[in-house]
Amino acid sequence: MSVYVRRLRSEDLPSVLRISKWLHENSRYQVFTYNEEKVEHLLSLSLNPDSPVFVVVALQKGSDEIMGYFHGYVDFHYFSDMKYAGDWAVCVLPLHRKYAPKILRLMVQAFEKWADKNGAKEVSIGASTEAYGTGYKKFLQRMGYRDVGFLAVKGR
């Protein structure tokens, strides 16, 4: 199967919003309300090419079906006036998981290229959904990322 990624277009928003809702419902984030208007706003920011927000979608050549998306940003580091890039959401739908290594590689490479262009000194990608296996971490390590810590949560 031939897969490619491209920047988000306004006509992609309904599909990406459905994927984001699925991700919300199938992750630890389901304890939080889902604010579709907020998510749509954050996704839409990437439609401006000068925005510090980035979204790519993955598609199969010859199809309009979105297989997954990567939503990231560039911001100034807490300690510095230098920029870093991070991710807000990364999702490949279960139906397309057999293509996940290729889809993720293309999405991460596109994000890294965009982050470089936007002056990021570092790229940080993580997983906190509790909806992933060990494969994603291993994939990121093969892409040159290192494990730098952990995230602990406590519900209320």
Language-model region placement:
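A conserved beta-turn-beta hairpin within the catalytic core of GNAT-like acetyltransferases
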Residues: 76-87, 146-147
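Conserved beta-strand in the GNAT
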Residues: 57, 65-75
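A short helix-loop-beta-strand connector motif used in the catalytic cores of GNAT acetyltransferases and
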Residues: 44-57
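A short beta-loop-alpha structural element at the N-terminal edge
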Residues: 2-18
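Conserved beta-strand-loop-alpha-helix junction that forms the acyl-donor binding cleft
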Residues: 107, 123-135
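A short, internal acetyl-CoA/4′-phosphopantetheine-binding micro-motif in the GNAT/acyltransferase core
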Residues: 88-100
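Conserved acyl-CoA
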Residues: 106-121
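Conserved GNAT-fold acetyl-CoA-binding loop/helix
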Residues: 24-43
